[in-house]
Amino acid sequence: MKISYNRLWKLLIDKGMRKGELRDSAGISQSTMAKLAKNQNVNTDILVRICSALDCTLDQIVELTPDYEE
C-alpha cells in the first residue's frame, strides 16, 4: 500500500492554514513536514497530533492506495 497526504494539503487549504502554522500548532519538525510532502511514512503519534491540531480524523488527512506490482 502507498500512503498519500494529499487530503491533508487539501484540508489545510480549506481551513486557510499555512504549513508553518500546522507545524507550530502540531509541534512537528520541518523534516517531518518534508516527509509528509514526499508522501513518506511518519510516526502515528505525529498523525494524531496533526488530527488534534486540525480537529479532524485520520481518514481526513491520509489516503492508502494499492501498490500494484507487475
Regions flagged by a language model, labelled:
Residues 1-20:
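A short, Lys/Arg-rich alpha-helix, primarily the initiator
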Residues 2, 11, 35, 62-70:
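Short, charged recognition helix plus adjacent turn
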Residues 9, 20, 34, 48, ...:
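Residues within the helices of the helix-turn-helix
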Residues 12, 23, 51:
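The alpha-helix within a helix-turn-helix
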Residues 16-34:
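Short alpha-helical DNA-recognition segment
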Residues 40-52, 68:
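Short, basic-rich loop-to-helix N-cap that marks the start of a DNA-contacting helix
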